């Protein structure tokens, strides 16, 4: 008898949302089919599936051991969320010599259903970063006697939902900073910055209304700007590696000496980005809005307001929905939004981060490449174009702390 051949082995998921994207949350049932097409008859020992979800980080650092000796230190850590195995056809036995227990599959197309339940405990949102990832996948393995197994792995996306309607994410965020410029023995007037946003939580596709007042009492021309940053933090063996990425930004009008500019709800749109990851012990993804004043020839004055990017949008008049699948469907809509036009570069990395901080905490290489890689993960596979400039990195340490309110010089009248 001439044995047949395996023409194709594929995996398909039963989607829970209207966008036909396999997206799930903790407690959901993941179901689908392993599709097998053969030409002629084949004998099969087993058809197995293996489903797994895990977060993993890895990076290396060069060390100097003295006497012109260097070595590489590896940092790795992993968290497993679930590990499920099932046999769709056959048995576990690996004996090829026994004819007993083999299954015959006839020529044509065949479907084998599978299902498993995700844990009820919180799961980290799917993510791809420079030094780590959160991945969920199903692997099918077809075992035949005296032949190598046929294997296929397919990823699916998990959202750990963040509801921005919670009180902590609805609270306004505000701050004030001031800076006085010095040039040799001359002291210029201060530059002051106050900014406020209506809440902390947003979803991709929303626009942040920025309320700000910038007063320029210095002798220089300055430019107020705002930018959204993503911060990826990876943890292993008591160490932390950090990557910071520009997401979106805007520019105000140039402000001459003695002038004041007011933003009454200036809009900055959030592009399609990964939700915040706040509950994973080895990977953390956070966002912030930086409102700053670009000062030629001096370190910029900047103010950071924390953001949380969620998955369940703001409900008008307090209306709520309890359907996780409908929330998924609703949130799939913003994933198709177009990316913004190429933003201008924010303040330079050297202006706001010391050399020591850079060596200790920040990763080398282009952070833009990291963000492109994140957007190419299963959650954003359909985003075709990425036009961000390579962003500089920044620190939240303010080298010019606020002066006491009573000591603030007033801008001279003109």
UniProtKB/Swiss-Prot annotation:
Span(s) of short sequence motif PPxY motif 1: 346-349
Which subcellular locations apply to this protein?
Cytoplasm; Cell membrane; Lysosome; Endosome
Q: Which domain of life is it from?
A: Eukaryota
Q: What SUPFAM superfamilies does the database record attribute to this sequence? A: E set domains
> Where this protein primarily resides, as one coarse class?
cytoplasm
GO CC terms for this protein? cytoplasm; early endosome; endosome; lysosome; plasma membrane
Its function, per the record, reads:
Adapter protein that plays a role in regulating cell-surface expression of adrenergic receptors and probably also other G protein-coupled receptors. Plays a role in NEDD4-mediated ubiquitination and endocytosis af activated ADRB2 and subsequent ADRB2 degradation. May recruit NEDD4 to ADRB2. Alternatively, may function as adapter protein that does not play a major role in recruiting NEDD4 to ADRB2, but rather plays a role in a targeting ADRB2 to endosomes.
User: What's the name of the protein?
Assistant: Arrestin domain-containing protein 3
Which organism's genome codes for this protein?
Answer: Bos taurus (Bovine)
Q: Which gene encodes it?
A: ARRDC3
